[in-house]
Regions:
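HhH-family (HhH-GPD) DNA N-glycosylase catalytic core used in base-excision repair
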Residues: 1-181
């Protein structure tokens, strides 16, 4: 890595790894919570919806948070999502994601928290690095950049930032990647 690139990366890190960055970023949603399970749930769902216009993302995740009664774990375990996200509902929930398609995230999260205390606990049963574990859990390819999922992993694993949580202690920040396009 060149000196110039190192300098630029440090500059960006200093600019974006500040608490005031949280206010207008999707990471604001998991920052509303203190319980690990709530942070994991809203964090994953926020990351999955983090594509397109930032204002639209913030509006949709705020709507989702309200729908969950600002209690993600309780919402998942209560199975209220079965009514809110019907298998038959092909209408758009957010951009090209239908209600039926988004339901699969709730199904997976329910399975996790019905059997495990945390999502981190569930992921440790899978082989590979954190991205491979998360992709295996979600049933998606780990061969594409998966920028949204890498962002989620960064939030959960990195410990040296006002933005990230560092609540997953059994996975190493050294195993995180930064996808570039």
């Amino acid at each position: 890595m060149t000196e110039e690139l190192c300098r630029q990366l440090r500059e960006w890190a200093e600019a974006y790894h500040q608490a005031d960055f949280i206010t207008n970023d999707p990471v604001q949603f998991p920052h509303r919570y203190v319980r690990q399970e709530d942070i994991e749930i809203i964090g994953l769902l926020t990351a999955v919806l983090s594509f397109g216009n930032r204002r639209m993302i913030l509006r949709k995740v705020d709507e989702l948070d309200a729908l969950m009664g600002h209690a993600p774990l309780q919402y998942v375990l209560s199975r209220r999502w079965e009514n809110d996200f019907s298998r038959e509902n092909q209408r758009s929930f957010y951009r090209m994601v239908s209600y039926a398609a988004f339901r699969t995230y709730f199904e997976k999260l329910y399975a996790v928290y019905a059997e495990n205390r945390t999502l981190e606990d569930a992921l440790l049963a899978f082989q590979g690095n954190p991205m491979q574990k998360l992709c295996a859990f979600l049933g998606v390819s780990d061969r594409s950049p998966q920028k949204k999922l890498n962002m989620f992993l960064r939030w959960m694993i990195r410990r040296d930032s006002a933005v990230d949580f560092g609540i997953w202690r059994r996975m190493s920040p050294a195993d995180l990647i930064i996808p570039l396009d």
